[in-house]
C-alpha cells in the first residue's frame, strides 16, 4: 500500500525535476528547454496513475494522485504533442540549413507520399499516432520502474520494457541512416528526407528522457544498485556491447553514437 509519505514524495519529485531539468541542445533552444522540463516531470508523475494499490488509498491520497495525473495529461501531454507537431518545421529548417534532400511538408506531393507509404494517414494523423505511441512507452517504462522495487524479478521487467522501447523506435519508422558527411555533420548520421528526419527527432525525444534526466534522484530509491547500459539498437556499437553487462554505482556517460540507440536504466537489488 502506498502511504502518505510516498504520495508526497511523488509530488516533491514532480516539482524538483521541473526545477532541476537542463534544456536539451537544439537550434530552437528556448522551446526545447521548456519541453525538456515538462518532459522530465514524467519520471515519477507517469507512475502516479499506474500504482496497483491506488484503490486502497484514502480519499485525500486519491485526490492528490488524480490531481497530479490530470496535470500530467493536460499540460505535459499537450507539450509533447505540440513539440512533435512543430518538429515538422524544425525538420525542414535543419534540412534546409545543411542542404539535405527533403520533401516539403506543405507540398501537395506530401499527401500522396503519406498515403502511399502510411496507408492513407495524413501528416498530422501520423504525428498524432507517433505521439500516442511515445506516451505509452514513457508510461510503461516509468510505471514498471517504480513498481519494480516491490517485485523479485527486476531483470524481467526491464527486459520487457526495453522490448517496448525498441519496438517503438524501430517499427514502423524504418529510418535509414547513411554515412555522415564530413562537410556537413562529421560523426553524425542523418536521414535522407524531411519525413525520415521527423522520426529521427522523435527518436531523439525518447532518448532525451534518459540522457537529460536527473539520475542522481534515483539513488534515493530503496535497493538501488547502480546503472546498466541497455542496448536498444539492432547494430549497437562495441562500446555499448562491452558495457551492457556491467553495473556502475556512478552514472557512466554514454558518448553520442550516430548509429546506436542505447540508454541507461537503474538496477535494483532483489
Set out the residue ranges of the language-model regions:
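N-terminal leader/targeting and assembly helices and adjacent pre-domain segments
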Residues: 1-192, 205, 270
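Acidic, glycine-rich two-metal-ion catalytic cores of nucleic acid-processing enzymes
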Residues: 178, 182, 186-270
Amino acid at each position: 500500500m502506498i502511504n502518505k509519505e510516498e504520495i508526497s514524495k511523488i509530488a516533491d519529485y514532480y516539482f524538483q525535476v521541473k526545477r532541476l531539468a537542463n534544456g536539451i541542445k537544439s537550434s530552437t533552444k528556448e522551446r526545447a528547454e521548456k519541453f525538456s522540463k515538462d518532459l522530465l516531470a514524467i519520471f515519477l508523475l507517469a507512475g502516479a496513475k499506474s500504482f496497483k494499490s491506488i484503490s486502497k488509498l484514502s480519499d485525500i491520497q486519491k485526490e492528490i494522485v488524480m490531481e497530479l495525473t490530470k496535470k500530467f495529461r493536460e499540460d505535459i501531454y499537450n507539450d509533447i504533442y505540440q513539440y512533435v507537431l512543430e518538429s515538422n518545421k524544425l525538420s525542414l529548417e535543419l534540412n534546409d540549413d545543411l542542404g539535405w534532400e527533403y520533401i516539403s511538408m506543405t507540398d501537395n506531393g506530401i499527401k500522396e507520399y503519406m498515403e502511399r507509404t502510411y496507408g492513407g494517414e495524413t501528416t498530422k494523423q501520423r504525428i498524432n499516432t507517433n505521439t500516442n505511441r511515445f506516451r505509452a512507452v514513457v508510461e510503461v517504462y516509468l510505471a514498471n520502474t517504480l513498481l519494480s522495487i516491490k517485485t523479485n524479478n527486476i531483470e524481467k521487467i526491464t527486459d520487457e520494457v526495453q522490448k517496448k522501447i525498441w519496438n517503438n523506435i524501430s517499427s514502423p519508422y524504418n529510418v535509414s541512416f547513411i554515412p555522415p558527411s564530413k562537410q556537413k555533420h562529421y560523426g553524425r548520421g542523418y536521414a535522407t528526407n524531411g519525413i525520415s528526419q521527423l522520426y529521427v527527432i522523435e527518436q531523439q525525444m525518447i532518448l532525451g528522457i534518459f540522457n537529460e534526466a536527473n539520475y542522481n534522484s534515483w539513488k534515493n530509491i530503496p535497493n538501488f544498485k547502480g546503472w546498466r547500459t541497455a542496448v536498444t539498437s539492432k547494430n549497437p556499437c562495441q562500446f555499448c556491447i562491452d558495457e551492457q553487462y556491467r553495473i556502475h554505482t556512478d552514472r557512466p556517460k554514454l558518448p553520442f553514437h550516430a548509429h546506436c540507440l542505447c540508454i541507461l536504466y537503474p538496477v535494483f537489488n532483489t
